[in-house]
Amino acid sequence: MILYRLLSWLPFPLLYAAAWLAYVLLYYVARYRRAVVQQNLRRAFPEKSEAEITSLAKSFYHRLAQVAFEIVKARRMRREQFLERVRLVNPERLREASDGLRESVIVLTIHQGNWEWMLHGASIALDIPIDPVYKPLHNRTVDRLIYDIRSQFGSRPLSMAESTRDILRRRREFRIFVMVADQSPIRRERGYWTRFMNQEAAFYQGAETIAKMTRFPVLFAQCRRLRTGYYEVEFHEVATPPYDKESHEIIDSYVRLAEQAIRSEPESWLWSNRCWKR
């Protein structure tokens, strides 16, 4: 916690200098999940040379360190800083989907750019609370820290275990529910398997199930890095009701948009995940 407090108070130039040192430690010293990252990159981009894979891996670790430190910094950032550093490209898409911010919407995204800053930037710019659905971390101290960061501007984080019940109970209230849906379920036999980045991957079906039960429209939020410490968010349509109960149109559309986003900026996606492990 002492380190967290120190990092959160650092001005941005010093924060990114510290992030560079963390990148060196992660990649060269600790070699944090290097084998997993390189294997994932090789499978996703079989056309790339080994030199290109290594370069992409290094860029990923540098971005990972920067994003981690930015998330810590978020606790000390003002609303004006988020408005300056996170730009919404097409907020009208969200307003249209929500019938003028009156009907609830499910927004799916991926671990790309800075998904935590995206939450704050959109919530502040639109002046509405955005409720993220999250998977609790094993470390209770870190989990509480992340919870506090996510809820600092009025958002109400929902754990995956309580999300369906809570969303159904409040289905007549206007809310924006955000789900980072690119993690594989622990019990992969319960997931929906489809082709993703040249490999078969399992995806949680919860977001699709909730959308069909509530008839909420579904959007995809793509977070792009413009330069160090600055991002833009663009919304894309995933699916709108009525939904076919027998199809997986929502997941299929989400996976297609997720893959397009990753291929456009591969170094900023979370390659350390074991997405394709059966």
Features from the language model and the residues they span:
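A conditional alpha-helix N-cap/helix-loop micro-motif detector
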Residues: E84-P91, Q112, N139, P157-M160, ...
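Residue-level marker for well-ordered alpha-helical positions
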Residues: A35, E116-W117, D143-R144, R165, ...
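Short acidic/polar alpha-helix capping motifs at helix-coil junctions
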Residues: I2-L6, S59-F60, L83-E84, I110-Q112, ...
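Catalytic core of membrane glycerolipid acyltransferases/transacylases, capturing the structured
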Residues: Q66, L101-A161, E173, I186-R195
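Membrane-anchoring hydrophobic helices of lipid-metabolizing enzymes
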Residues: M1-T109, D143-R144, D148, G154
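Non-catalytic C-terminal accessory region of glycerolipid acyltransferases
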Residues: V29, S55-K58, D99, I124-A125, ...
